[in-house]
Structure formats: C-alpha cells, structure tokens
Amino acid sequence: MELGLGEPTALSHCLRPRWQPALWPTLAALALLSSVTEASLDPMSRSPASRDVPSPVLAPPTDYLPGGHTAHLCSERALRPPPQSPQPAPPPPGPALQSPPAALRGARAARAGTRSSRARATDARGCRLRSQLVPVSALGLGHSSDELIRFRFCSGSCRRARSPHDLSLASLLDAGALRSPPGSRPISQPCCRPTRYEAVSFMDVNSTWRTVDHLSATACGCLG
C-alpha cells in the first residue's frame, strides 16, 4: 500500500528512531555540494547533453515518510495484549453441616418446648379465673334487665394441691375401709373457689342503676 501525505496509517503510531529524520537532509546536502564542486573544477568538460541530464537524486529510505517521519512495519495486534477469557464464577457454598452441640441444643429446645406446652395444658386444667358474658336476668337475683355483664368465676382441678389428709381419705374410700355417711360422700381434694370478689353495676328495665356486691370473682384458689 502506497503512503500518501494526507492518509493516516497505523504505521505512524509505531515507535521511530531519532537519527533517521536528520539523515536524509544530510545526504541531500552532501550530493548538492558534490555537484557544485564538480562544476567549478571542470565547467567545459561536460557536454550540453550531459548538462541537460539532471543530477541523480538519492531515493529516500523505504521507511521514510514526507515531513521527516519514519515508518516501521509493525502490527497493532502485537502491541495489544491478547484478550483474557472470563474466569468462571465460583460455585455457591453448600449448606453448612450442623455441629453436634447445635444439634444437642436443638433437641433440648424441643424438649423444653414440649414441657412448657404440657405445663400450659396443666395450667389450663388447673384452678384458674375465667370470664363470660351473661344476661342479668339469668343471674337469679330477681333483677329485670336487658343488659349483659361480664361474670368472672373459678374452675379447674386442685389435685396438685391435695394435702396428706386428702390423699389418705381418697385411699380409704377407694379401698372401702372407710364407710361414708348415708346420702353424702366425703370430698378427697380441695375445691377451686374465689378468694376475692368485686361488685357489678347494671341498669334495669326502669332505667335505674343497680349494684350487686361480691358478684364477680377476681382471684381463685384451692380451698378445703
């Protein structure tokens, strides 16, 4: 490919030695000086035919470019580093194995949860305070009212609160060693009863406020 004055080429981007731009003007000056010296020494020795022949002009180097630039055959591909292949992504970490202490802690937590649920079930069956909405007319106190009140009461088992007397009484009754009085049977365990009460107020059908003391329970306990 011929190199022109206005054509940008990839060769201009290569590195060039510093001595080649100054070499060509020096050679041209030496050739001109040689021709002047030869003409001054023997002006008549040259024929008219030889005068018309121009002096030989040294051809510039093959890698010389106009404007004092020197071109070197090089490849941009050699200057560029080769493309690197993308690195494969590391595999995701697998699930960590559960250590024996963690497994033991999990088993203990499960047993503790079972015990706590069992204790909650026992507490639900035990003596405790409960509440329910009931009509005033169903209280049996002779009041006529269309209102509903929250009636709190005690219920549940007191087997865990039995004393040695209660345990012995139950054993004697079961074995038939103790004759119970006719028409009644001794109670071999305490009873779940209110230990505190509160007053309840409501309005009757005549728009009159009524208050009943010690009507609703506020605390429960095993008595007897």
Swiss-Prot record:
Gene Ontology terms: cellular component: extracellular space
Tissue: Cochlea. Expressed at higher level in sesorineural epithelium than in the modiolus region or substantia nigra.
Biased composition (Low complexity): 96-116
Stretches for region Disordered: 41-124
CDD domains: TGF_beta_Artemin (cd19381)
SUBUNIT field: Homodimer; disulfide-linked. Interacts with GFRA3 coreceptor and RET: forms a 2:2:2 ternary complex composed of ARTN ligand, GFRA3 and RET receptor.
InterPro entries reported for this sequence: Cystine-knot_cytokine, GDNF_fam, TGF-b_C
Propeptide positions: 40-111
SUPFAM superfamilies: Cystine-knot cytokines
GO biological process, one term: glial cell-derived neurotrophic factor receptor signaling pathway
Annotated Pro residues bias: 80-95
Family of the protein in this entry: Belongs to the TGF-beta family. GDNF subfamily.
MF annotations from Gene Ontology: glial cell-derived neurotrophic factor receptor binding; growth factor activity; receptor tyrosine kinase binding; signaling receptor binding
Lineage of source species: Eukaryota, Metazoa, Chordata, Craniata, Vertebrata
Protein's recorded name: Artemin
